[in-house]
Amino acid sequence: MAVNCNNGTLNVYVPDQNNPWNISKVLFVFRRLGFSVKFKEVKNYLNSNPNDLIDELFDQALNMPVSPDPGWANFNNADFSSSGKNRGAFFRDHQKIVFEDFLNNGLRERLTLFWSNHFVTEYYMYNHPAYTFRYYNNLQKNALGNFKEFVRNIGLDDAMLMYLNGYENKNNAPNENYARELYELFTLGEGNGYTQDDITETARALTGYNSRTNGGPISFNPNRFDDGEKTIFGKTGNWNYDDVIEILFEEKTDLIANFICI
């Protein structure tokens, strides 16, 4: 069943005498699709076709590269220890990058901020500036992309694996935290279309992402993967991480769309 959660008109805005394209509307656009606009630029936008302006803002956001590596995006614990700076200084450097991006990048960073509140992590849980920066890049890269691929990518993000205990999820000691939040917070909503058995079986399919050397990237360890059969949403097989994403989006398409929409 298709879901329509749009409560307004879908008619294309056409300026006229009763509803003109003016300063108020230009500012409205940039407040909704960014964080405002320099007032000296407003005059130029007043001379633009509003629909062309919207297309331009989306094209810019879609083609914008992620924030470049500040020089420490791939540091491990040893690199941070030998840098001569404490980790708080790196975190503050990252904050400056984020604020500059907010000022300069408009729509893409507006959506990056939005998704950071959806696929949330908390820095104090892992205290790793490189993880935080790569998580930020992950949000930027997927902010206007395919939601299914976004979900696939975010679950393997080092910051997320640390924050929701994915790195502790092993075949001999499964951890259900990420499996639960994948459904409850990220895709379906609390108690909506899944059972505790689905969570338990999903956690088994997500095992194995545990290998980490000196605070470097987290990688898959097949020796810690549960390679037995699992039943998720009524489907049985030797499911793994990618299978979970495929089954979720095949079986729960409308529920996901409705949850994200509202």
Kindly label every feature range from the protein language model:
Residues D16-P20, Y45:
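Extreme N-terminal leader/anchor segments
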Residues K25, V29-Q140:
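N-terminal accessory alpha/beta regions
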Residues A2-Q17, K25, V29-L33:
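Substrate/cofactor-recognition hotspot
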Residues M1-G8, A73-N77, R92-V98, H128-I262:
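Active-site substrate-binding loop specific to GH73 endo-beta-N-acetylglucosaminidase modules
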